């Protein structure tokens, strides 16, 4: 077999970011009702996002019909790509979806908060699929800056994504549908109308600073808030800082004078 590199495709190991849909009940009727309720306010928010079904929170001996959950997610326009399960949950491989291994980006000491919701933070290990380079669609803007501070001085349009391994500084507007992600702090000296996720590897000390807060989503270390829960008038469109306090997002006016 020839080992010559093909100009048309390649196979290599890689990491793919997905949402984790964590199942905590075997009551599928209740799950469906809650899912529809959650998405009816913002039906386009997670449209076409890939998601892995996580069943690790189920009790020993419990199991669910993954095919039904897969259909539920399809019904709200999400795209299930696999299942994350414990080694003892052998039934999880019966749904026709591949079993995936997830690395939780939250720190081991972090607790699950009942009143909070996990942000799209896990990394799922998978092999990259073969692709013809000539047929690829333009990818969203995706930048890394090692562990250094990354500075962005141009507007971010819908569909663009920025990822910083350290802190992230944005000097131009972040439009609806754009996403900025950092393992450290995020500073936005312009309107934030898209998504901002700080401390994505479980850094509970990370903060978000913004001079005009009008976001679709804000998140720190896996705790997030969307427009489903409207922001109060004293912070909407204002200069703010966002931090975590006991697993809750605190949004506070930023006094600049």
From Swiss-Prot:
SUPFAM superfamilies: Cell-division inhibitor MinC, C-terminal domain
Subunit structure, interactors included: Interacts with MinD and FtsZ.
Domain of life: Bacteria
Taxonomy of the source species: Bacteria, Pseudomonadati, Pseudomonadota, Betaproteobacteria, Burkholderiales
Pfam families, alphabetized: MinC_C (PF03775), MinC_N (PF05209)
Transmembrane segments: none
Disulfide bond annotation, renumbered to this chain: none
Similarity comment: family membership: Belongs to the MinC family.
Gene3D superfamilies: 2.160.20.70, 3.30.70.260
NCBIfam families associated with the record: minC (TIGR01222)
InterPro entries cross-referenced by the UniProt entry: CAP/MinC_C, MinC, MinC_C_sf, MinC_N, Septum_form_inhib_MinC_C
Keywords associated with the record: Cell cycle, Cell division, Septation
Function description: Cell division inhibitor that blocks the formation of polar Z ring septums. Rapidly oscillates between the poles of the cell to destabilize FtsZ filaments that have formed before they mature into polar Z rings. Prevents FtsZ polymerization.
Protein name: Probable septum site-determining protein MinC
GO terms classed as biological process: cell morphogenesis; division septum assembly; regulation of cell division; regulation of cell septum assembly
Keyword hit for Cell cycle: yes
